[in-house]
């Protein structure tokens, strides 16, 4: 066999066995034992939910009333209650000031805060009233 044929055979062998080895490595050898999790669609989750109150559309949390729904990302969002008992979730204001950060991280003080220069729930309330 000529040298070029050996090169082709060697490259082909490396490709076949190399890809199998890489696949086994990245799948940790469990490529045939993969488990497929069946995730329910959003519609199925809503329709099959046993909630007997109000089902929050963003979090699928069951609460007594719509105004009791939590924000989907409470660590980074403030829940601002509007005058008509509706609410809107906004991003917490970004600040390096520890005093303001403590206020906005507080679940009671944060939604009631109205600090000049920050787009917080006070700002949302003013914007809603002037709407």
From Swiss-Prot:
BP GO annotations: ERAD pathway
Disulfide bonds: none
Source taxon at top rank: Eukaryota
Transmembrane residue ranges: none
A GO term from the CC aspect: fungal-type vacuole
Disruption phenotype: Leads to long chronological lifespan.
UniProt signal peptide: 1-24
Keyword vocabulary terms for this entry: Signal
Entry similarity comment: Belongs to the LCL2 family.
Function noted in UniProt: Probable component of the endoplasmic reticulum-associated degradation (ERAD) pathway that acts upstream of HRD3 and USA1.
Additional remarks: Present with 1990 molecules/cell in log phase SD medium.
PANTHER family linked to this entry: LONG CHRONOLOGICAL LIFESPAN PROTEIN 2
Protein name: Long chronological lifespan protein 2
Organism per entry: Saccharomyces cerevisiae (strain ATCC 204508 / S288c)
């Amino acid at each position: 066999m000529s040298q070029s044929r050996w090169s082709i055979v060697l490259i082909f062998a490396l490709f076949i066995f190399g890809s199998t080895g890489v696949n086994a490595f990245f799948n940790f050898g469990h490529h045939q034992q993969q488990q497929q999790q069946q995730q329910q669609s959003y519609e199925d989750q809503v329709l099959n939910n046993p909630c007997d109150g109000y089902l929050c559309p963003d979090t699928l949390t069951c609460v007594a009333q719509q105004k009791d729904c939590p924000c989907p990302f409470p660590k980074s969002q403030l829940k601002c209650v509007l005058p008509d008992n509706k609410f809107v979730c906004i991003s917490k204001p970004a600040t390096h000031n520890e005093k303001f950060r403590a206020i906005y991280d507080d679940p009671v003080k944060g939604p009631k805060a109205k600090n000049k220069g920050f787009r917080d729930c006070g700002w949302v309330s003013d914007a809603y009233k002037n709407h």
